[in-house]
Amino acid sequence: MAKKYDFLFKLLLIGDSGVGKTCLIIRFAEDNFNSTYISTIGIDFKVKTIEVEGKKVKLQVWDTAGQERFKTITTAYYRGAMGIILVYDITDEKSYENIQNWMKSIKENASAGVSRMLLGNKCDIEAKRKVSKETGEKLAKEHGIRFFETSAKSSINVEESFTSLARDILLKSNKKPGPSGREVKLTSTEKKSSSKCLLL
């Protein structure tokens, strides 16, 4: 059977527990929102194919648990990621301050040159804002990465942010030597639906 995509990119969302990583992924992959999601246990992923620069790009978006007790499991997934999205909650200053620790975690565990992006989530809750947009922009600029304020609930900048990161990875991969760029082939045995890893 013919392949239905040109590239497969693995993206990883990291950030403190409760910042809305799962909600962002479900909004992006399924265009759905539910405020009663329980915390992710270990790691989970969703798949969505989008069009970028005339190419069909299949995104495998991995959702990680933000709690410290799952750190050993989640950091194991950094290595194969081509894009890492750092998420904080604009109504929770601590989640923003912890972005520096997540950046350190990327440096220690991810592949060199991985594409990164910073998202300030829950921008629909303006009345409870604790982190200004300028503060987020400043941090992203310091690290030389893209920044978006998003809302999974109101569907603000969700599609745009994922697409822009996919475009960055695609353009970067096109500059690499070799005929295949960063194309990754899936075997027919690989599951195409959502998969969960639970710790009992």
Curated annotation (Swiss-Prot):
Regulated by guanine nucleotide exchange factors (GEFs) which promote the exchange of bound GDP for free GTP. Regulated by GTPase activating proteins (GAPs) which increase the GTP hydrolysis activity. Inhibited by GDP dissociation inhibitors (GDIs). Belongs to the small GTPase superfamily. Rab family. Mg(2+) binds at T22, T40, D63. Its EC number is 3.6.5.2. GTP binds at S17, G18, G20, K21, T22, C23, T40, G66, N121, K122, D124, A152, K153. Residues 198-200 form a propeptide. This is Ras-related protein Rab-13. It catalyses: GTP + H2O = GDP + phosphate + H(+). Switch 1, switch 2 and the interswitch regions are characteristic of Rab GTPases and mediate the interactions with Rab downstream effectors. The switch regions undergo conformational changes upon nucleotide binding which drive interaction with specific sets of effector proteins, with most effectors only binding to GTP-bound Rab. The gene is rab13. It is a lipid-anchor. Residues 173-195 are annotated as: Disordered. One of its GO terms (biological process) is trans-Golgi network to recycling endosome transport. Residues 182-193 have a biased composition (Basic and acidic residues). Its cofactor is Mg(2+). A motif (Switch 2) lies at residues 63-80.
